[in-house]
Amino acid sequence: MSKPHLLIVEARFYDDMADALLEGAKFALEEAGATYDVITVPGALEIPAAIAMALDGADNDGTEYDGFVALGMVIRGETYHFDIVSNESSRALMDLAVSESLPIGNGILTVENDEQAWARVRRSDKDKGGFAARAALTMIELKKKLGG
């Protein structure tokens, strides 16, 4: 059986936090023996579009991925923008997962402040990057088990 090959799509709006999320995801995938590619997008709203582009590329003889890991950070500010980015990025990932039967680990974090963010991105703490990667691996296995 071949190793799963995943695409990590990371939003780099908060570089230091993105580094920590990516570190956790890479560690989890390497520990599981999976292979991966990493692409970067400007923010969380662009992550679902990048996954859709990867699907289109696979349809045109590009790289085919067994699953996807979405990594990003949305920190509440003073405007309604937080709600839009949080809700729409999650909705778009769910739409892709359901309509395309895609294994996606959602590591787009929505937090109130930097303290909450750091507690979630560090591998030594909540390791949400690793959690998202392991979720994607679990969904890949479920898809195989169900005949997908």
Swiss-Prot record:
Pfam family, one: DMRL_synthase
Keywords, comma-separated and alphabetical: Riboflavin biosynthesis, Transferase
Keyword Transferase: yes
Lineage: superkingdom: Bacteria
CDD domains: Lumazine_synthase-I
EC numbers for this chain: 2.5.1.78
GO biological process, one term: riboflavin biosynthetic process
Binding-site residues for (2S)-2-hydroxy-3-oxobutyl phosphate, renumbered to this chain: E78, T79, R120
Binding site for 5-amino-6-(D-ribitylamino)uracil: F13, A44, L45, E46, M73, V74, I75, N106
GO CC annotations on file: cytosol; riboflavin synthase complex
Pathway this chain belongs to: Cofactor biosynthesis; riboflavin biosynthesis; riboflavin from 2-hydroxy-3-oxobutyl phosphate and 5-amino-6-(D-ribitylamino)uracil: step 1/2
Molecular function terms from GO: 6,7-dimethyl-8-ribityllumazine synthase activity
Active site, UniProt feature: H81 (proton donor)
Functional note: Catalyzes the formation of 6,7-dimethyl-8-ribityllumazine by condensation of 5-amino-6-(D-ribitylamino)uracil with 3,4-dihydroxy-2-butanone 4-phosphate. This is the penultimate step in the biosynthesis of riboflavin.
Family stated for the protein in its record: Belongs to the DMRL synthase family.
Protein's name in the database: 6,7-dimethyl-8-ribityllumazine synthase
Originating species: Agrobacterium fabrum (strain C58 / ATCC 33970) (Agrobacterium tumefaciens (strain C58))
Classification of source organism: Bacteria, Pseudomonadati, Pseudomonadota, Alphaproteobacteria, Hyphomicrobiales
Gene: ribH
